[in-house]
Design a protein with these regions (language model features):
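Bilobed "Venus flytrap"/periplasmic-binding protein-like clamshell domains
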Residues: 38-60, 120-177, 182-184, 288-292
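A structural signal for short loop-to-beta-strand junctions that line the ligand-binding cleft
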Residues: 41-42, 104-113, 136
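Secondary-structure end/capping motifs
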Residues: 226-296
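Pocket-lining segment of extracytoplasmic ligand-binding domains
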Residues: 165-256
C-alpha cells in the first residue's frame, strides 16, 4: 500500500489551490469579456414628437449607449402594445393600460408620459357628451390608457378603433359622433372647429386629488434582458432625456421628422407638455398614479385579475 508523503500532500494542496485560483481568474476574465460584448437590442417607440424627443441623443450618437447596439422600431402605440405581448422587442414604449395584459416585463423609471392636469380629450361637433351612450366614439386602441380612462369615467360605450391621427377628420366627416384624441391632436383639434366636450386629464386630476395622468411608459422584457441590463438601459434613456432637455432646440428639430406636418410651435408645445419631471424620473407620484389606474380599472370590473407591477428599481 503506497503512502503519500507530507511533501506530496503539500504539493496536492498547493496544486488544488492553484487550480481554484486559475479557475477564478478565468471566470473573472470571461465575465469581463461577456460584459464588454455588444448586445443588439430592438427598442420600440412611437412616431410622436415627445417619444422622438426622448430618443434624440441616443439615436444621434450624442451619448454613450454602453454595450447596447440599438435598432429603433418606430410604430403606432397600439402596435407596440401588441408587440409587447409577444416579447418581440427588448425595450418598448407601451400604454400604461397595456401593462395589465403583460407578463415578464419591468417598468423603466424614465421615459414615461404623464399629463399634469391635462391628458386625452373627447371631441365632437356636438356641444356636450349628453347621450354619448347611444353614439359612436372613435378610439385610438382598446389597450390605450386614453381608452381605459374614458371607460372608467363614462362606462361602456360604442367604440370604433381607428388610427389615432384619423380620428379628428372622422368626426368632422360624420363617420363617428365623438373622438377620443391623443398626441398633438389635443392641441390642433380646434383648427377643425370641433368642440372639446370632455377632458379626461381634468377628470383624473379631480378624481385622484392631483396625481399625474399615467399615459405612456417604457418597459423592458425580463425574458430578453437580465436585471442589470435593464437598469443600465434605464440609465441611458434617462441620460438621453436630460441631454435633450438641455439641448431643446436641436432635439425639437430632430422630432420634426416624425411631426406629421405639424408646425414646429405645436410640436414644441406638445413636447413641453409631456416631457416633464416625471419623464426624467417617474418618482413616487408617477408610480402611485399607475397603481391608481389599475386599482380603478379593477374596481370598475374592467380588469378581472390582479396585476403585479414591477419597476427597474
Amino acid at each position: 500500500m503506497s503512502m503519500i508523503s507530507s511533501k506530496d500532500h503539500k504539493f496536492i494542496i498547493n496544486y488544488n489551490a492553484f487550480e481554484i485560483f486559475l479557475t477564478f481568474i478565468i471566470n473573472i476574465r470571461l465575465l469581463g469579456f461577456v460584459n464588454n460584448m455588444v448586445l443588439k437590442i430592438k427598442v420600440g417607440h412611437t412616431p410622436d414628437s415627445d417619444d422622438a424627443f426622448m430618443f434624440y441623443a441616443i439615436e444621434s450618437g450624442l451619448i454613450s449607449t454602453g454595450n447596447f447596439e440599438i435598432e429603433h422600431i418606430v410604430e403606432d402605440i397600439e402596435n407596440l402594445n401588441k408587440k409587447a405581448i409577444k416579447h418581440e422587442l427588448e425595450v418598448t414604449a407601451i400604454s400604461a393600460h397595456a401593462y395589465a395584459y403583460l407578463s415578464d416585463y419591468v417598468i423603466l423609471n424614465s421615459g414615461g408620459s404623464f399629463g399634469i392636469n391635462y391628458g386625452p380629450i373627447i371631441i365632437s361637433k356636438k356641444d356636450s357628451i349628453n347621450n354619448i351612450q347611444n353614439a359612436f366614439i372613435g378610439i385610438p386602441g382598446s389597450m390605450t390608457s386614453a381608452y381605459l380612462l374614458m371607460s372608467i369615467a363614462l362606462g361602456k360605450l360604442h367604440c370604433k378603433e381607428m388610427l389615432f391621427s384619423d380620428i379628428p377628420n372622422a368626426v368632422l366627416n360624420d363617420e363617428i359622433d365623438y373622438g377620443l384624441i391623443i398626441h398633438e391632436s389635443q392641441i390642433t383639434y380646434s383648427d377643425l372647429k370641433l368642440n372639446k366636450v370632455f377632458d379626461l386629464g381634468h377628470w383624473w386630476n379631480k378624481t385622484t386629488a392631483g396625481l399625474p395622468v399615467p399615459l405612456g411608459i417604457n418597459v423592458a422584457s425580463s425574458k430578453l434582458l437580465n436585471s442589470d441590463q435593464i437598469v443600465e438601459f434605464d440609465k441611458i434613456l434617462r441620460e438621453s432625456i436630460r441631454y435633450n432637455i438641455n439641448h431643446l432646440e436641436d432635439a425639437v428639430d430632430f422630432s420634426t421628422k416624425y411631426g406629421r406636418n405639424t408646425s414646429r410651435n405645436i410640436l414644441t408645445k406638445f413636447i413641453q407638455m409631456y416631457v416633464n419631471d416625471y419623464t426624467v424620473e417617474m418618482q413616487s407620484q408617477g408610480k402611485k398614479s399607475i397603481s391608481k389606474l389599475i386599482e380603478m380599472a379593477k374596481s370598475n370590473n374592467i380588469l378581472k385579475k390582479d396585476v403585479e407591477i414591477k419597476y427597474s428599481y
